């Protein structure tokens, strides 16, 4: 907060791009159902030790130092994030707008699926379901338990799950009736493009998502995404046209979405819809033009 204020004191137009809710709360990156940030973060329900529950109020009050700077502008990547700003006690009055994340649509693009699988040493004749999480299956925001239950309700000798992340716990997937492959952490865009092209469906069971960068990466490669209807995901997925939006935390609907995506994985019309959508909304050209329009309005 101190560093942000030191920049604001320069008096120049200052933009903060909100990747999560941290700026709006007493410390939470995602508030989920908690609405305390609407008025005052105090007695945080996520802090178990009574002796330190005051911390969130202290952090929240500390952020009040920022709210009256007229040169502060907030940019949200989705309508959901913008709505959170509008409801926040701290920054509801601050100038704000929605500009989505951008994507290198030249780098992330379709390539031959067989070639991609051969290069990654993945099976050629199996339906592959990709799940990605920054901390493998251990990140609570990524909803692995829900996806695990959805996959547990599926069966088929011709299916396999591919997990992208830091690690995969063998015990957590041992009950599945199909094979699994751990890709570990992949950070370069070339390898990610190969992986998206190698699979048949990309599933995000995320319970907190300000945007959904991996979703547009998959779409740009022609791979159908499946995700819950929450956060910034509805800004990206148009139900059954550019992916599948499952009802929030609905395991059965998530399973149905995966099966729908698998059955439409070679649908050229859907692939075209996805690629066109990414190009028209998230390409470098489109997004940078939005930033420049905003800059020209206030400079």
Task: Describe the function of each predicted region.
Residues 23, 39-113, 117-122, 128:
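Donor nucleotide-sugar binding/catalytic pocket of nucleotide-sugar-dependent glycosyltransferases
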Residues 194-199:
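Short alpha-helical donor nucleotide-sugar binding micro-motif in glycosyltransferases
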Residues 224-227:
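Short hydrophobic beta-strand element within catalytic cores of glycosyltransferases
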Residues 239-240, 244-251, 260-265:
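Conserved acidic donor-binding segment of nucleotide-sugar-dependent glycosyltransferases
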Residues 168-190:
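Nucleotide-activated donor-binding/catalytic signature segment of Leloir-type glycosyltransferases, i.e.
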Residues 266-298:
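A charged, aromatic-enriched C-terminal amphipathic alpha-helix characteristic of glycosyltransferases
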Residues 123-142, 148-151:
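Conserved donor-binding/catalytic core segment of Leloir-type glycosyltransferases
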Residues 207:
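Aromatic "clamp/platform" in nucleotide-sugar-dependent glycosyltransferases that forms part
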